[in-house]
């Protein structure tokens, strides 16, 4: 066994009172969970609020934790549910914040390359905002969280085939949008969000 303890073993240790085990888990997963929520919520304040709530739920529910799935699946399910709860409470959420070029890290790349990357990132952000929420969620669970289709299905409460279909539609729409003008095709009335 490697020196790196499995996440589920760390959570079990935390359940038994080992706070240092929780600190390791938090350190491993905080960035990916926050990125997932930020891209899902499209609002930094909402993402931060939901992020805090998700970790609070992990802490409060530690005595009930059972390692029936990967810890990351458990964690992203809680984060997903916290976001859904937030949306239900607020019935709306704001759009993404504008990219601030001054916050971007400096690079030694040629200015044209930097500009090209910034524009591509902006097109991706716009395209993500234009995806139906179900497709955006599945895409982010795959790309940000690195979950498998089975894990995505578990997190979203859908079948594997539904998760696969939503991912396929999302990737197709994002590819079209990034190659084109940055706008994901708008849904037609009656179009499935599969």
Regions found by a protein language model. Name each.
Residues 33, 37, 62, 75, ...:
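Hydrophobic-face residues of short alpha-helical interaction/recognition segments
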Residues 1-32, 129, 151, 190-194:
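N-terminal module of bacterial RNA polymerase sigma factors
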Residues 2-3, 13, 42, 94, ...:
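C-terminal edge and immediately downstream basic/flexible tail or linker adjoining helix-turn-helix-like DNA-binding
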Residues 15-24, 34-53, 160:
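Short, charged helix-capping/linker segments at alpha-helix termini
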Residues 26-44, 61, 128, 173, ...:
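Amphipathic, Lys/Arg- and hydrophobic-enriched alpha-helical face
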Residues 86-107, 115, 183-187:
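Short, basic/polar amphipathic helix motif occurring as a linker/hinge flanking DNA-binding modules
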Residues 73, 80, 84, 135, ...:
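DNA-recognition helix of helix-turn-helix
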Residues 15-16, 39-42, 53-70, 89-90:
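Sigma70-family region 2
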